[in-house]
């Protein structure tokens, strides 16, 4: 998958988890940009992303993600 394909799929996951069809992701999107994205929803989001992409993040990866761009970078590395 290329970056654009991952972003499209990830956008669908975010829209589903946060029940908001208006969400548009960019590399710089953070939890501050999405009202419903709190610490509890973060757990749901990570689980949904792992399920959608059929992979598991390490704790180091999860704690190190500062924005959507970093999440996409990890997903791209795993897709290789």
Describe the role of every protein-language-model region.
Residues 2-37, 41-47, 51-80:
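Phosphopantetheine-dependent thiolation modules in NRPS/PKS and related acyl-activating systems
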């Amino acid at each position: 998958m290329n970056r654009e394909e991952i972003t499209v799929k990830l956008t669908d996951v975010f829209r589903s988890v946060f029940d908001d069809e208006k969400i548009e992701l960019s590399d710089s999107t953070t939890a501050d940009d999405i009202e419903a994205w709190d610490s509890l929803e973060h757990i749901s989001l990570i689980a949904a992303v792992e399920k959608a992409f059929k992979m598991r993040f390490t704790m180091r990866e999860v704690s190190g993600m500062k924005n959507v761009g970093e999440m996409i970078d990890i997903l791209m590395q795993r897709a290789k």
